């Protein structure tokens, strides 16, 4: 099958539900728990105190092209947004939004290809991808086109049967495994031979578990069969009764261990193939792109003088990527305004968001580097400053983990 392209404007009608629920919540006609159950499915949550909202902007594969960057820059200036946050799922969040602004931006985002639908709640979340896919020296192959096709396919589940909990899918292009594909709900880890190893039912949090390697040497065009099998597994064996044990990693226990889980997965995969639906992917050659030459060295930092160790060579001759790690993943919003001004005339320039809440500006020419380095100069300087952090309990309404504090402290 050809890649299923999701048209953002097709989701516009859905946002009427979000609009109505948000209005009722801010009028005091809907309680916070009920509102969360609705708003989460649109990538938005009320912040602590219930007087402001967060909006999570889905960026499949962490790709923020110039159109999306312009939308973000314009929104920051137009609505005077004072707080933004980069996430570990390679998305960007607007914070401290009032009722009118969150309703407006959720719909306006569709015009530049940003769909917030499914950004929270029990839905497939943003598909994560190694941030330098397609440009990284030494990568096994460019996984990005396949990940984007997977992201579009996963969006079709949003209007399907209710999942037990959220479903996170990740792709990695090298053994560095920056997206933690080996312990996602479903992970595709690239191999040197141009295929994927597939991992299922992994995850962190309470009772963390590595994913079960359910398949090796899976051809790239077959990935949708494995996504569909995972979907069927989650519907069949996920825990709908206890949310604390509803994430996919608990299915390993439910089914009697890793081997039993693998057997059940293969049974679902067989059923999916017998359905007769053609899920074999066909991508245009231009989207797949050329691969790096075998034996190519990994991307390395260049220009180490004057702080230029944030610049990395790409596998495309004469092009560079600039890395920026805002402290706490929460840069001054003006950064995105200034970045757009600095790179809007650079052919092919875009941002790639990373799982550690940093980002790269890619496809820079040598003559572009000084300007990009200047705009991003407020980047972390130490390992401590590169620590990954959520937006914080003073802003969001987190689940309470205080019962874990004492045992954890004692172990340390």
Residue ranges and their predicted role:
Residues 43-62, 312-329:
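Short glycine-/aliphatic-rich beta-strand segments at the starts of folded cytosolic domains
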Residues 63-78, 329-346:
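Short amphipathic alpha-helix segments
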Residues 76-81, 110-117, 346-347, 376-382:
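A common structural junction motif
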Residues 92-126:
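Hydrophobic or amphipathic alpha-helical targeting/insertion segments
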Residues 131, 136-200:
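Active-site cavity-forming subdomains of large catalytic enzyme subunits
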Residues 169-250:
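Mobile "lid/hinge" segments at catalytic clefts and subdomain interfaces of large enzymes
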Residues 239-296:
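Terminal amphipathic helices with adjacent charged low-complexity linkers/tails
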Residues 402-408:
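Conserved small/polar residues in nucleotide/adenosyl-binding loops
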């Amino acid at each position: 099958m050809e890649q299923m392209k999701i048209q953002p404007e097709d989701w516009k009608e859905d946002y009427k539900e979000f609009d109505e629920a948000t209005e009722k919540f801010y009028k005091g006609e809907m309680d916070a728990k009920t509102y969360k159950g609705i708003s989460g499915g649109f990538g938005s949550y009320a912040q602590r105190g219930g007087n402001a909202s967060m909006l999570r902007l889905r960026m499949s594969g962490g790709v923020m092209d110039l159109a999306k960057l312009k939308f973000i820059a314009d929104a920051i200036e137009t609505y005077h947004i004072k707080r933004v946050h980069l996430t570990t799922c390679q998305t960007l969040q607007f914070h401290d939004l009032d009722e009118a602004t969150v309703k407006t931006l959720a719909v306006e985002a569709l015009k530049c290809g940003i769909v917030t639908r499914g950004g929270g709640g029990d839905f497939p979340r943003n598909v994560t991808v190694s941030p330098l896919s397609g440009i990284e020296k030494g990568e096994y192959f460019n996984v990005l086109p396949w990940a984007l096709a997977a992201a579009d396919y996963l969006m079709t589940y949003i209007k399907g049967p209710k999942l037990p909990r959220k479903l996170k899918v990740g792709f990695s292009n090298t053994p560095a495994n920056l997206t933690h594909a080996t312990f996602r709900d479903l992970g595709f880890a690239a191999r040197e031979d141009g295929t994927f190893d597939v991992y299922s039912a992994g995850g962190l949090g309470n009772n963390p578990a590595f994913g079960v390697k359910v398949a090796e040497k899976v051809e790239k065009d077959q990935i949708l069969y494995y996504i569909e099998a995972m979907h069927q597994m989650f519907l069949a064996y996920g825990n709908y009764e206890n949310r604390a044990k509803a994430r996919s990693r608990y299915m390993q226990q439910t089914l009697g261990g890793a081997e039993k889980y693998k057997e059940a997965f293969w049974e679902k995969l067989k059923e999916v193939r017998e359905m007769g639906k053609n899920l074999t992917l066909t991508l245009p050659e231009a989207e797949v792109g050329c691969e790096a030459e075998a034996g190519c060295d990994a991307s390395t930092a260049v220009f180490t003088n004057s702080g230029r160790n944030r610049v990395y060579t790409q596998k495309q001759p004469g092009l560079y990527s600039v890395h920026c790690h805002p402290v706490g993943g929460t840069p001054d919003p003006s950064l995105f305004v200034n970045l757009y001004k600095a790179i809007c005339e650079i052919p092919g320039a875009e941002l790639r968001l990373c799982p550690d809440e940093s980002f790269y500006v890619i496809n820079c020419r040598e003559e572009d580097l000084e300007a990009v380095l200047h705009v991003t100069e407020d980047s972390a300087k130490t390992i401590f400053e590169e620590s990954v952090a959520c937006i914080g309990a003073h802003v969001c309404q987190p689940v309470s983990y205080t019962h874990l504090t004492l045992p954890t402290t004692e172990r340390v």
